């Protein structure tokens, strides 16, 4: 049951993040991910993970947690305010005070619900801000993370040690119903990274909808199919956790699902060339989004 709730939370997060990714924003707020950055992501992620693992082993755990909790809480406050998108001064003050109150409550109690709220703000905003520039880049990123996740979960104790040893709002957690003292968890990386591909497919659908005159009612096809595939991947992950009774690299199941779903959709619709040639955040795409908003 915990797995179903965590999976539902992940689906809600990627849905909101994908929708937000198509909203008009200031150019400096957009972080475009190209193929070079896609290759560097797992490298930097691996280095960071190992450094955190070494810090946990050889430094004071309490000191490390305090620093990371403070940093994560500050980032969550910024993301939480951004989620409300207040237009007035009063709205900005209200949103800021509300987010600070939640962060302080988490900092004081470490309650899992407050942690999840902050984690949601981080994840949804990350999906909306970080934007993959093409399907090829997304496939490269998820493909690299596929091997990254397998190695660090099955090949070493690093990821499991860091995930369970550091209590920061960088994962969704839920007390197990049979044993409330134990927590089920889903890392934000398993939400944000596939979510970037889902967000790209949402923008691709928007692009296709504007340019298509033959099938205007099927403008959510790619996003819908990839969203379903992601949900099925989460289901397989939960089954693997239940069957093997051990930590699982979620991207082992989620990466192939989110890579193959758009590919099969494009193949079935005879749109492989269109999918491979689409580039996100071009001037044309921005114009198309503006047109869509005005209709």
From Swiss-Prot:
Main location: endoplasmic reticulum
EC numbers, comma separated: 3.4.23.-
Protein name: Probable intramembrane protease C25B8.17
GO cellular component: cytoplasmic side of endoplasmic reticulum membrane; endoplasmic reticulum; Golgi membrane; lumenal side of endoplasmic reticulum membrane; perinuclear endoplasmic reticulum membrane
Domain notes per entry: The PAL motif is required for normal active site conformation.
Cytoplasmic-facing ranges: 22-35, 85-89, 131-139, 205-221, 269-295
GO biological process: ERAD pathway; membrane protein proteolysis; signal peptide processing
Family: Belongs to the peptidase A22B family.
Record localization: Endoplasmic reticulum membrane; Golgi apparatus membrane
Lumenal side: 57-63, 107-111, 161-183, 245-249
Cited InterPro entries: Peptidase_A22B_SPP, Preselin/SPP
Catalytic residues, chain numbering: 149, 190
Motif mapping: PAL: 249-251
Alphabetic keyword roster: Endoplasmic reticulum, Golgi apparatus, Hydrolase, Membrane, Protease, Transmembrane, Transmembrane helix
UniProt topology in membrane: Multi-pass membrane protein
GO MF terms held by the record: aspartic endopeptidase activity, intramembrane cleaving
Ranges annotated as spanning the membrane: 1-21, 36-56, 64-84, 90-106, 112-130, 140-160, 184-204, 222-244, 250-268
